[in-house]
Amino acid sequence: MTETNKNIHQEAEQEITLIDDQGNEELYQVLFTFDSEDYGKSYVLLYPASSAEDEEVDIQAFAFTSDVAGDASQGDLFPIEDDEEWEMVEEVLNTFLADDNMQ
């Protein structure tokens, strides 16, 4: 099991615009960010800003570098390409969702 900093940061209404291969822009909300000591990276999980609260959504995950204030919406996003890294991100997301459903 990987060692992940369980310090999950829920962001206050941060938005990020993603641009797809065809140049289409879509606005996303930051669900939360977290740091992994094993990978030495920070991660951001996003969902479409246009989705309704009760709607099932596809959550996007990226490694990121933040600005000097730690703002994920002002830094650079990088794809997660390693399978083990993806498994770690999914584990953190599943824990977050399970904890969120308990409240």
Curated annotation (Swiss-Prot):
Domain of life per record: Bacteria
InterPro entries attached to this UniProt entry: UPF0473
Family: Belongs to the UPF0473 family.
HAMAP family: UPF0473
Name of the protein in its database record: UPF0473 protein LCA_0390
Species annotation: Latilactobacillus sakei subsp. sakei (strain 23K) (Lactobacillus sakei subsp. sakei)
